[in-house]
Amino acid sequence: ANTGSIMESSTGFPGNTGQVPNSVAPLAEMLRLNGYCTGAFGKWHETAAWETSVSGPFDRWPTRQGFDKFYGFIGGETDQWVPLIYDNLTRVTPPEKEGYHFTVDMTDQAIGWMKAQQSMTPDKPFFMYYATGAVHAPHHVPREWADKYKGKFDAGWDKVREETIARQRSMGVVPTETALAPKPEDIKDWDSLSGDEHRLFTRQAEVFAGFLEQTDHEVGRLVAAIEDIGEMDDTLFIYIAGDNG
């Protein structure tokens, strides 16, 4: 749809302008025109960088791409503690409460919208686009989530990757003959690193793992809310894995 690369890397040449033509019918718009309530929550990386200011144009913002409701951030990433949030087209300040985290906030917003929609228009189906900022950088997660993985990666990445592929083979996640890809030359052998590097890199791995588990937890809250409103058996989940884990 005229976007040959991510929006920030568009060139202006045909097929790579970073601008979805208005002649293209977005999925959400097709569903909305056929009676769906539509909401987008979290990350929206579908708008060219020069169209993301409060001055617009807003043609490629979620609410002009078929979504009745949008709560989230525009672009590839945001601070999870102090995010740059938009409610539809309006810049809003994150709630001022202790322990605030955007993934929790966007999940609360998604659940609230879904329950309100079902309360007001129970006869209408809904389509929700739920895209967390995780686990894209910045890797911001409450300490208690990261601390759950204390010591899990102390053996270092050379050993951990071997243990991981062995576990995946035994669980049937990958074929038994699957071999590890060669390690990139730029990644040093774990045993050649200093003690400070060991501490830094193991903590980074703990934070990443905690960030991922926290995200799983929030997705679980959303799924539980769908079950609470009695729509689990009539809901289709489409999971799309991104490029950041």
PLM regions with names:
Residues A1-G245:
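Formylglycine-dependent sulfatase
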